[in-house]
């Protein structure tokens, strides 16, 4: 089945794209998109408008993630080449010289939204939602998604979409400057498209116009400078320094707004390749592919076991004289949730002055290793398999997602290293 279909009515061509197939790193999709743009360029003098819509069937996200998870550092050059070719196709679309209008309905996510941003006008239905969720998978958006969103909305208004992976309603997207109009129904949308074409709308992106100014203030304006002074610290506070993607996105936004558009695309591609091949992205992508019923009795029982292990270790640390503030800081450094309150039967702090106080690193590792050891005990007992254990530990118990989960944490550290560190912490590891 073709990923792109066209229908011509006089001087207007309507293009329908399979949203699930839009992939900047797919040679097959690039060939079809390139053939479409070749056709549009060849007929340019006979056309007065292009309307692009999207089939919004569920995307086969797992297939794309498997491809991304296979990326290695050695393939970074090939990745940059593919992205450069795709960026070139979108630039040809937005410099076509005739109006290109995107009509949007339902969920418009990821690369489908990225392609829509390369159109000169975007009109959506009221129920549509818009998101660039790549940050949740440890990656930066790519293929102009950062450069275009930041230039259309301005630095601050684009942050929820880019840095948080938030889903914007049609009204929010309109207010942010990502849409030009919102229609109540399909008929209303058709009327808005017709009026836009009849009004001889400019076939030009704002940043390609000489008089373009960044919405919300230039980078050297007082409000934006104030925002940039606190934004990095706010990101680190939110992520604990464990998620490189949000900081990479912010860097791509700011650096890209200081240069011409084509250079901004290159900067964005570099940050994507850097984050996509990172262990954090690989772990987050793997977690997203695990299928597990988190509401099942087995998942609930395992989660309860982990919570008890966490509470037990925090009580043991309190008994070793570790203060509440130090416990909280160590848990945060590990990427774990705040320690639970002391249990009713918790031992009082030790009065043995000769016993050395645990170091900060030891406290952090004891919290992590307590959960990892309890996880492997449950896996060994057949209570849960390792994939389910990883997902439950992250989603229900707050084990740091960047590690890939409590079972995967041991694989990452290495079984021998894990056993040695457990021994150094005086924590007897379960059978590995």
Describe the residue ranges of each PLM region:
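Substrate-binding/catalytic subdomain of NAD(P)-dependent oxidoreductase enzymes
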Residues: 179, 246, 252-254, 259-277, ...
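Glycine- (often His-adjacent) and acidic-residue-rich active-site loop
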Residues: 46, 54-85, 136-139
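Amphipathic alpha-helical segments at domain termini/boundaries
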Residues: 1-16, 114-118, 160-271, 284-299, ...
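Conserved CoA-thioester-binding segment of acyl-CoA-metabolizing enzymes
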Residues: 1-53, 77
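Glycine-rich beta-to-alpha active-site loop
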Residues: 87, 91-137
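Hydrophobic, secondary-structure "cap" segments at the distal end of domains
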Residues: 145-156
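Gly/Pro- and small hydrophobic-enriched strand-loop and loop-to-helix capping segments
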Residues: 120-142, 179-193
């Amino acid at each position: 089945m073709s990923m792109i279909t066209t229908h011509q009515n006089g001087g207007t061509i309507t293009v329908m794209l399979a949203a699930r197939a839009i992939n900047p790193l797919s040679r097959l999709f690039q060939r079809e998109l390139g053939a479409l743009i070749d056709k549009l360029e060849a007929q340019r003098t006979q056309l007065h408008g292009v309307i692009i819509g999207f089939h919004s069937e569920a995307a086969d996200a797992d297939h794309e993630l498997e491809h991304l998870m296979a990326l290695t550092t050695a393939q970074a050059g090939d990745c940059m080449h593919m992205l450069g070719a795709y960026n070139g196709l979108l630039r040809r679309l937005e410099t076509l010289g005739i109006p290109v209008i995107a009509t949007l309905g339902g969920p418009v996510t990821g690369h489908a939204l990225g392609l829509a941003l390369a159109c000169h006008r975007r009109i959506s239905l009221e129920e549509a939602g818009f998101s660039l969720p790549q940050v949740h998978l440890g990656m930066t958006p790519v293929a102009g998604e950062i450069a275009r969103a930041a230039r259309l909305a301005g630095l601050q208004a684009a942050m929820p979409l880019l840095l948080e992976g938030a889903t914007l309603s049609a009204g929010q997207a309109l207010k942010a400057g990502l849409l030009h109009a919102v229609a109540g129904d399909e008929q209303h949308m058709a009327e808005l498209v017709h009026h836009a074409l009849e009004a001889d709308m400019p076939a030009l992106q704002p940043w390609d116009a000489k008089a373009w100014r960044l919405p919300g203030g230039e980078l050297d304006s007082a409000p934006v400078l104030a925002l940039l002074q606190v934004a990095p610290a706010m990101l680190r506070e939110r992520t604990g320094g464990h998620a490189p993607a949000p900081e990479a996105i912010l860097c791509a936004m700011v650096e890209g707004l200081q240069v011409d558009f084509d250079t901004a695309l290159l900067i964005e591609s570099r940050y994507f390749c850097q984050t996509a091949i990172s262990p954090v992205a690989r772990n987050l992508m793997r977690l997203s592919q695990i299928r597990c019923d988190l509401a099942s009795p087995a998942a609930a029982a395992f989660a309860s076991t982990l919570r008890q292990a966490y509470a037990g270790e925090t009580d043991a640390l309190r008994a070793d004289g570790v203060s509440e503030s130090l416990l909280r800081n160590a848990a945060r450094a590990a990427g774990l949730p705040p320690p639970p309150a002391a249990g009713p039967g918790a031992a009082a702090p030790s009065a043995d002055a000769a016993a050395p106080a645990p170091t900060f690193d030891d406290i952090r590792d004891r919290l992590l290793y307590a959960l990892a050891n309890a996880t492997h005990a449950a896996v060994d007992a057949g209570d849960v398999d390792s994939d389910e254990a990883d997902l439950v530990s992250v989603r229900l118990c707050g084990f740091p997602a960047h590690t890939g989960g409590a079972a995967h944490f041991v694989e990452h550290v290495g079984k021998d290293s894990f056993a040695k560190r457990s021994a150094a912490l005086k924590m007897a590891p379960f059978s590995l």
